[in-house]
UniProtKB/Swiss-Prot annotation:
It catalyses: oxaloacetate + acetyl-CoA + H2O = citrate + CoA + H(+). Citrate synthase is found in nearly all cells capable of oxidative metabolism. It comes from Bartonella doshiae. One of its GO terms (cellular component) is cytoplasm. Pathway: Carbohydrate metabolism; tricarboxylic acid cycle; isocitrate from oxaloacetate: step 1/2. Disulfide bonds: none annotated. One of its GO terms (molecular function) is citrate (Si)-synthase activity. Keywords: Transferase, Tricarboxylic acid cycle. This is Citrate synthase. It holds the Pfam family Citrate_synt. Belongs to the citrate synthase family.
């Protein structure tokens, strides 16, 4: 990944993130990141088929989940499940073997959505939904999360595309905290599943993967558009611990290119679900307007980042 923070540019293997998010799908970006080039149509078909052949997880995982409380944080569950994968797939735990590393990569890409959906289903007391390999990667994930046995699940192309974009935008971001954690764990010779579990544990932090959750919590705390000036004043007050979440980035000193894509995606999802009047979106739009025109934010280069709209989008999709 290449980032130019001053110009607001993000490239995956030389390709602009805007191009990949608009014209491709997540598995195409996975192929690009793994192999360095975009796939031909035949290579893409073969790669998709290979991923879909590995979407099932060992049936023992169903019993593994029973050891968790229903109200466990999903990231805690994911850390445990990813670490446990090394106990189930012994033929791909040698990190020094390139072939085993690739098999582990394929398995992780394939099985993480299944495990994440299982974690969600377990938390709400619903039956697990097995993967359906005729569906796309994103559609399969949404179905595993939200399908119920008593009715047929209808794939919504707008929501599926939104989920796909969320996956693409978060696929890679240079040497960030979780990537550094994975590489550090790997430097000790730890198996790939343990390394990824360590990375997910790092991603759990509120300053990293938890930022969109914190941003959504902030919008709820503000409560209404009328109260925005009060919170803006608090954000400017050095003696007030309140911080505006979803603004600014350690790398980007310009508008986060992922935020523009996420903003468009958020509007598409809310329109599809007939929720354009969502009060959280009204607050977000007004906050963004103020931040882009207020001298304080301009001087400090506090532009909206990808977390600003992704929390609202995920909430609208049905994730708690």
């Amino acid at each position: 990944t290449y980032i130019d923070g001053d110009k607001g540019i993000l490239l995956y293997r030389g390709y602009p993130i805007e191009q990949l998010a608009e014209k491709g799908d997540f598995l195409e970006s996975c192929y690009l990141l793994l192999y360095g080039e975009l796939p031909t149509q035949q290579e893409k078909n073969d790669f998709d088929r290979r991923i879909m052949q590995h979407t099932m997880v060992h049936e023992q995982f169903s019993r593994f989940f029973q050891g968790f409380r229903r109200d466990s944080h999903p990231m805690a569950v994911m850390v445990a499940c990813l670490g446990a994968m090394s106990a189930f797939y012994h033929d791909s735990i040698d990190i020094t073997d390139p072939q085993q590393r690739m098999i582990a990569s394929i398995r992780l890409i394939s099985k993480v959505p299944t495990l994440a959906a299982m974690a969600y289903k377990y938390s709400i007391g619903q039956a697990f939904v097995y993967p359906h390999n005729s569906l796309s990667y994103a559609a399969n994930f949404l179905r595993m999360c939200f399908a119920v046995p008593c009715e047929e699940y209808q794939v919504n192309p707008v929501l599926t595309r939104a989920m796909d974009r969320i996956f693409i935008l978060h696929a890679d971001h240079e040497q960030n905290a979780s990537t550094s954690t994975v590489r550090l764990a790997g430097s000790s010779g730890a198996n790939p599943f343990a390394c990824i579990a360590a990375g997910v544990a790092c991603l759990w932090g509120p300053a990293h993967g938890g930022a969109n959750e914190a941003c959504l919590k902030m919008l709820k705390e503000i409560g209404s558009v009328k109260k925005i000036p009060e919170f803006i004043a608090r954000a400017k007050d050095k003696n007030d611990p309140f911080r505006l979440m979803g603004f600014g980035h350690r790398v980007y000193k310009n508008y986060d290119p992922r935020a523009k894509i996420m903003q468009k995606t958020c509007h598409e999802v809310l329109k599809e679900l007939n929720r354009q009047d969502d009060p959280l979106l009204d607050i977000a739009i007004e906050l963004e307007h103020i931040a882009l025109n207020d001298e304080y934010f301009i001087e400090k280069k506090l532009y909206p980042n990808v977390d600003f709209y992704s929390g609202i989008t995920l909430k609208a999709l049905g994730f708690p």
